[in-house]
Amino acid sequence: MNNNGSLKRTIAVSLTNYLDAGAIVAGASGLTLWQKYLGLSEVHLGWLNFISANCLGAALGAIIGGVLADKYGRKFIYTYNLIVYMVGVLLILCSVNFPMLLAGFLITGISVGIGVPASWTYISESSEINKRGRNICISQMSWGFGPMIILLLGMFFAPGGYLFSWVETLAHAIGGAELAGDALNVFSSRVVFLSLLIVAFIAWNLQRKLDESDEWKATREAAKAKGEDTGLLHAFGVLFSNKTAVKTVCFLASIYRTWNLVASVMGFFQPHIYETAGGVSNEQANMLSCVGWAIVVAITFGLSFFIDKLPHKLFYVLGLIAALATWLVIISGVNGMGGLWAFSILWGINGGLSVQIFYALWGSELFPAKFRAGAQGLMFFIVRGLSAIWGLVFTYIYGENGEGFTLAAYCMIALLLISLIVGVIGAPNTRGKSLEEITKERYGDS
């Protein structure tokens, strides 16, 4: 397979990750503006978070996407899924009441989930043996670019921001010269979502031209030639009746679930950390977050040069050591800008060597093509579904004013230790092997 071709396909597919992460950050950063504009209560905000791209919406979408990608092909997802995404974003853009906003968040979240298993699976299946890890890293860089760019746009377009005058001009052109107050301010969030709509349209035009995965086609044709059932129930029946597949699901879900539970609640800790550091304005806090995401992108880019040459376990351990060091810094006290920078840099290193990279890589390597996307969709459903529940439980541990901060921090360390230990014990040796070789080693000729 042509090296440049695989890179081009990876970049086209990686735009999905930009849109996924961008939707999460755009939704979270604009909630206060929507709350004031629509007069939403904390219950309303809780529902928006619960069904969003960060929780239940993505969980449901992952199950749907995994099934569709295995049954109808990876190209099927890339032909239609971003149309669903654009409909969801357009609903948010045009929202004038809570039901519209809720529907937009849900549809966008489902689309985000649908794209995940197909994305990681397609990248691995279309990559050369010695470029599979590199291409997954390039894909993951988009998860860093998304939040970084959306945060910057949010800062520039926010009320009082450098480009808010441009937002005012646009808002008055659409809503009339009398538009003011919260109705005017919420246009800054609409503009951020507009940027996602534009990128989604570009990505859709690129992705719908992608070729189908050769491995999926070969597996499908072989199954038909043997007269095998290619239906959904049969695929999941095979998955759960195979001990190797079940053990793999448990292993991957364990390492990713424990790490993701920590990553998903970082938003609760950051305000507390900024307050502890003292004298940090909201703008400075956002800039620190942008720097953190820039570190994630830089570290992941560096990893892409070595992940196919050195043991995966080495980078997996280094990433979790950085994560544990981050929380030790937090527990010992973030005093002043020095501590704040240590926190941002360490968490950025963890993000650049994140468990998600290895989950995406191993998840696409350790299952046969006939239920590869479905298995990833199932695991993503489990992880994001538990994250939604954990987000509710965590608020009680943390407390309204952060009184449970220390206990919550120790919970984070315990979860990271579990991810580290399970990963070290179960990390597979797949480097330098084709997907066909890995499948034959693990599942035989069946």
Task: Label each region the model flagged.
Residues 1-25, 36:
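Cytosolic juxtamembrane N-terminal segment immediately preceding the first transmembrane helix
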Residues 28, 243-300, 391:
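Extracytoplasmic gate region of multi-pass secondary transporters
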Residues 28-60:
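Extracellular/periplasmic helix-loop-helix junction of adjacent transmembrane segments
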Residues 73, 94-99, 333-335:
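Helix-breaking motifs and short loop linkers at transmembrane-helix boundaries and internal kinks
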Residues 133-163, 167, 199, 380-391:
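Glycine-rich segments within core transmembrane alpha-helices of 12-TM secondary carriers
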